């Protein structure tokens, strides 16, 4: 199968169904480069009033793989706070959110606990939103990993687990979000990882699709630890060229999809693993709507993403699939309102119970939301 929008049977009409319950969005990011540790803090404070100049400077000093992942720099350089998320919601009813670590600049040792403290004090209530849980970060390789986890617990009663990104693509033109390949199989990582089960904590795993087997091995080694795969393990280049050599031709993109299908099916055999349908409009997948100075329509997203959603639900079942927005990381190519609507349309054929599970109950179960 060749993965292009013209490859799929066209959906003749896209309805605008509304959900009769409030959504839980278990994957959002918050940041404020003006007031928190941030890799671009100095730049933002100096040039924040001159966005075009700031964009040019960022594109000069930051690595191209990172810029290709972001697509547009403005969303990463601008504050994204509860009021910004609320504005993006549109007409959808969202009751509760889960904050997932956002690459806090003080990322070593106990520095990561600063992010948990900062998120805990953000005012979601004024936006009629509830902060349901915090997924922080910590490095299982750290000698003080257990103490860092306890510090997160002390910082917030909403702390439920961690994410440690292991996204490392063999194509060096695709941004690497960790400092070593095969992180999830490193001896130091595995030794520290044991603490999560002992402390009743969950793990958000994020890799590229070429690394799914590493998550499978991790899940087998720790069957008592709940693991959720973020962004369906990001099949980079599935919808277009990215990096130096990935997704360059229709046949390459077809191979990416087929390998992703096989590996995800094997991963789904591990019953402690859930999967988030999220992050599927990030530029790293090959989407280039932002280069057309527009966002994808609901219709376009339904056509592009339906094969991924169908396969994920087929292998995991509707009780282990979790909707999440990943906002604002997908904002270069879509609005939050249209993204939610597209997922509603794609999940409607599975029935009302599946809709409730995917948009609400599964997240509540996984993250132990009160």
Placement of each model-derived feature along the sequence:
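Mid-to-C-terminal alpha-helical segments outside catalytic/metal-binding sites
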Residues: 1-26, 35-87, 96, 310-322, ...
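Active-site gating/metal-coordination segments in enzymes
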Residues: 2-7, 110-211, 217-220, 233, ...
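Short, well-ordered coil/turn segments that N-cap beta-strands
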Residues: 20-22, 92-98, 127-133, 155-160, ...
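Conserved, mostly hydrophobic/aromatic
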Residues: 27, 97, 134, 162, ...
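Catalytic metal-binding/acid-base residues of hydrolase active sites
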Residues: 29, 103, 139, 233, ...
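Active-site gating loops and adjacent loop-to-helix segments of metal-dependent hydrolytic enzymes
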Residues: 32-83, 88-96, 157-182, 225-226, ...
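Catalytic pocket-lining loop regions of alpha/beta-barrel enzymes
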Residues: 34, 39, 47, 180-322, ...
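Alpha-helical packing segments of well-folded alpha/beta enzyme cores
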Residues: 81-88, 93, 115, 148, ...
């Amino acid at each position: 199968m060749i993965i292009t929008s013209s490859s799929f049977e066209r959906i003749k009409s896209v309805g605008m169904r509304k959900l009769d319950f409030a959504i839980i969005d278990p994957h959002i990011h918050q940041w404020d480069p003006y007031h928190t540790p941030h890799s671009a803090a100095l730049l933002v404070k100096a040039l924040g009033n001159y966005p075009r100049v700031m964009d040019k400077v960022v594109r000069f000093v930051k690595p191209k793989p990172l810029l290709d992942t972001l697509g547009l720099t403005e969303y990463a350089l601008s504050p994204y706070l509860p009021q910004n998320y609320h504005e993006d919601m549109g007409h959808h009813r969202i009751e509760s959110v889960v904050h997932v670590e956002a690459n806090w600049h003080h990322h070593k040792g106990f520095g990561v606990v600063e992010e948990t403290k900062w998120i805990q004090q953000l005012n979601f209530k004024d936006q009629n939103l509830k902060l349901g849980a915090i997924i922080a970060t910590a490095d299982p390789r750290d000698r003080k990993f257990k103490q860092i986890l306890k510090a997160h617990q002390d910082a917030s009663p909403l702390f439920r687990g961690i994410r440690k990104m292991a996204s490392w693509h063999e194509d060096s033109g695709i941004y690497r979000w960790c400092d070593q390949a095969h992180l999830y199989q490193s001896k130091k990582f595995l030794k520290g990882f044991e603490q999560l089960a002992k402390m009743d904590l969950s793990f958000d795993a994020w890799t590229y699709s070429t690394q799914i087997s590493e998550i499978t091995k991790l899940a087998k080694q720790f069957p008592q630890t709940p693991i959720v795969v973020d962004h369906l393990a990001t099949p980079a280049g599935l919808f277009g060229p990215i990096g130096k050599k990935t997704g360059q031709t229709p046949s390459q993109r077809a191979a990416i999809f087929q390998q992703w299908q096989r590996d995800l099916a094997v991963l789904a055999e591990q019953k402690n693993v859930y999967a988030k349908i999220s992050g599927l409009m990030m530029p790293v997948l090959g989407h280039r709507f932002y280069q057309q100075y527009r966002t994808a329509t609901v219709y376009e997203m339904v056509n592009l993403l339906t094969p991924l959603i169908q396969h994920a639900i087929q292998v995991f079942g509707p009780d282990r699939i979790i909707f999440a927005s990943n906002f604002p990381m997908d904002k270069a190519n879509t609005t939050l309102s249209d993204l939610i609507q597209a997922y509603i349309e794609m999940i409607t054929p599975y029935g009302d119970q599946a809709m409730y599970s995917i948009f609400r109950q599964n997240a509540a179960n996984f993250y132990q939301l009160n």
